[in-house]
Amino acid sequence: MNSKLTLLAIIEILTALSMGVAILAATYLLLKYIGKKRYDINENNQAFGIFTASVLFSVGYMVSSVIHPLLSLFRILSTKDDDTFHLLISFIGYGAIYILMAFIVALFVCFLGALIYNYITPIDEIQELKNNNLAVALVVGSIIVTLSLMTHDGVELLIESFIPYPDQYPK
């Protein structure tokens, strides 16, 4: 049995679950706070629920783009270091940075999706969500999800570019 590979699998599962739950909870609480405090949107509002679901899916999908770069990083780190504890700390540190970067990009993409809808239509999106307009929620949600699908690979490539690959040629 390859202990480093087993450690990689366990770390990946635990990291994905813990960070996934934390990021989705943070996103949900942020949307709930903004909806209630800033825009006075009721909790039983179906349109806001659809909008929230779209944002949660998009954020989760964008942050999932970190998984492959993290696996590459772990393989590189495991060849450099024999100490399991140091390997674990390095992986968690890099992983947190990469996940935070993907989370910030995901929030930006969601904000951009809502901004695009506001720009291309004369409708006040927030007021329509507040009025429980399902059609507006579906269109805005579709824009957000589509932008996430289109930018997912770019985010993965961006994260991949930060991996400290070893030099291929000696200097």
Model-based region annotation:
Residues 47-70:
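A generic, lipid-embedded transmembrane alpha helix
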Residues 4-22, 90-108, 171:
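Alpha-helical transmembrane segments
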